[in-house]
Amino acid sequence: WRETAKEYNYHLSNDKLKLLKGRRRIDCAKKVFQWINKEISIEELLRIQKIKVNNQIVLAKPFTGAIDLIKFCINIKLPIALVTSSSSDSFKIKSSANPWLNLFKIKILGDNKFITSGKPSPDPYLKAIEILNINPKKTWVIEDSYAGSISGLKAKCNLLFFSKDIQVLNKLTQEFNQNNIQKINEL
């Protein structure tokens, strides 16, 4: 989004970028649209952002140990799901470069027609919990963004916060029961 904003001579600060992390593209576009405050359309922002991000998406790689963790969960028959803000189109691009993403049998994507709001709303995780038919209090979400963490915690799940962003971690522990939040740097 920083590169997209530059097209309109607008600099997105790190704090503003953090606010976008983990959210659906359409929700990010609406925020950036407000900040830029130029005579453009949200559709134009989305078009430019898609061009810029498609070149970067294929470079995304999993966190160290992520694939092993997914395979372990599958092998012991632990119910798992992928809950992402990525749209179906974006997920196709990501999973073509990262086929391990297809290990997840259950995927809740950002444009899922059965969720009304994306992260930080609890809707995406509530949908996954419903499909998996599990107790959210016995569920762990692994997140690296504030929006995703809020989404999981509001759905009454426990959180493994996978980030070195201490400010976000501190904010989360102030807003929610710290017993439900664990911080990890590496899997």
Feature-to-residue mapping (PLM):
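Active-site neighborhood of HAD-like aspartate-dependent phosphohydrolases
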Residues: W1-K18, K154
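Hydrophobic/aromatic ligand-binding patch that stacks against planar heteroaromatic rings
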Residues: T4, F72, S151
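A metal-dependent, Asp-based hydrolase signature
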Residues: L19-N54, F72
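Short, acidic loop-to-helix structural element flanking the phosphoryl-transfer center
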Residues: N55-L82, S88, K92
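Substrate-recognition "cap/lid" segment bordering the active-site pocket of phosphatases
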Residues: L59, S87-W140, Y146, I150, ...
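Structural recognition of alpha->loop->beta junctions
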Residues: P99-D111, N170-L187
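Acidic, Mg2+-coordinating phosphoryl-transfer loop and its flanking beta/alpha structural elements
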Residues: K137-I181
